[in-house]
Regions:
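Generic low-polarity alpha-helical segments
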Residues: 1, 18-20, 41, 268
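N-terminal secretory signal peptides that target proteins for export/translocation
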Residues: 1-13
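Glycine-centered signal
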Residues: 4, 29-31
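Bacterial N-terminal signal peptides
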Residues: 14-27
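Sequence/structural signature of beta-propeller domains
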Residues: 32-367
Length: 367
């Protein structure tokens, strides 16, 4: 078992591995769903991908700007490493500070943090740090939120929120994308609440769903089309969970999905209209030993299907984390190309990390 601040991640049995990055193919399906292809882009393990980066350990969250490359939260090394859609590593890499690394210790003297969720900030006025605009914002298991401002410090994010004293453990991060007056949402797994911050990093309120069983905690979070989706899971247990929908003001709307198809659900993404039979669905990644990506009707929550390979077998990725689509350019990929991060591996490779992409193969690859 590998753990971070109380969250334990079980190692898979050696027999579960039949392909790279812990890829497992299970079961058969109708031909209509058997048309997706996965491609490893970067790994910190040799022979796993064409590009190798030792810092890509327990790759967790991922984010991009409209034309910017992909930024990855490397949870086990405390860095954010950056890659284009082909997996080519960019020269810049950014250290994520841990609790206590404020303005008095700007060089990270307390060591690196444990980044989880990451978001792109498109506002030049919201979420400034020390008067400088920030571009990417990170949450950590240490209970901190840091922002990267190239004008302030190009090589390290700057601490903006430190809630380590209240034992906060932020497992996910979401942001609004309005012209102004934006909010940031951090999923506090320990205190089972969503901390909502304004554009000055001030806490507005904490919210959640009091009707969720008490053994479930907030885990993943995503702002999609003006609504905040929150995934609840039972820490260290496995199958079963909930996905709630809230307004951007933190008002509960409904429980959209619940049941055994959610297994440590964390990543969420809205599929575009050209993603094959799973087009226009809500995709949800399961961060389990046998992690899958399931698709649901975004309005009713009805199960639609699971991403499967060309032969009709379910694509399974051990300890799957983030999922997000490209922006429609060569830097961060096609709008129907799904990029994923895979975290901990198995056995001796518990600190593995992989950045990969999935395309609907019937269309001849990404468009």
């Amino acid at each position: 078992m590998h753990s971070h601040l109380g969250i334990k991640y079980p190692a898979a049995a050696a027999t579960a591995v039949v392909a790279r990055v812990g890829l497992v193919l299970l079961g058969a399906s109708a031909p209509a769903e058997a048309q997706y292809r996965i491609r490893n882009l970067v790994s910190n393990q040799v022979h796993q991908a064409p590009n190798i980066d030792p810092l890509l350990a327990n790759a967790w969250g991922l984010a991009r700007g409209p034309t910017a490359p992909w930024w990855i939260s490397d949870n086990d090394t405390g860095w954010s490493t950056i890659y284009d859609a082909a997996g080519k590593q960019q020269s810049l890499r950014v250290l994520i500070p841990t609790a206590g690394n404020g303005p008095a210790s700007p060089t990270g003297v307390n060591g690196p943090g444990t980044p989880t969720g990451i978001v792109y900030n498109g506002s030049s006025t919201d979420f400034q740090v020390q008067g400088w605009s920030s571009v990417f914002i990170f949450a950590t298991l240490d209970g901190t939120i840091s922002a990267w401002s190239p004008g302030l410090n190009a090589n390290q994010a700057t601490l903006a929120v430190d809630n380590s004293a209240k034992k906060a453990m932020y497992t996910g991060l979401a942001i609004t994308s309005n012209p102004s007056g934006n909010f940031l949402y951090a999923a506090d797994n320990t205190n089972n609440a969503i901390d909502m911050f304004d554009g000055n990093f001030n806490l507005v309120k904490s919210f959640g769903d009091p009707n969720i069983p008490s053994n479930f905690s907030v885990f993943g979070i995503q702002d999609i089309n003006g609504l905040v989706y929150v995934a609840y899971a039972i820490p260290n247990v496995g199958a079963g969970g909930f996905i709630d929908v809230f307004t951007e003001g933190g008002t509960f709307v409904k429980t959209l999905i619940q049941g055994q198809l959610l297994n440590q659900a964390w990543g969420m993404a809205a599929a575009p209209g050209n993603f094959g039979p799973l087009s226009n669905t809500l995709l949800v990644s399961n961060n389990s030993v046998n992690g899958t990506i399931n698709a649901f009707d975004p309005t009713t929550g009805k199960f639609v299907g699971t991403i499967k390979d060309e032969s009709g077998k379910v694509i399974v990725l051990n300890n799957l984390w983030g999922i997000a689509f490209g922006g429609g350019n060569s830097t961060n990929g096609a709008i129907n190309e799904l990029f994923v991060t895979v975290g901990q591996g198995i056995g001796a490779a518990e600190l593995a990390g992989t950045f990969a992409s999935i395309v609907f193969d019937d269309e001849g690859g990404p468009k």
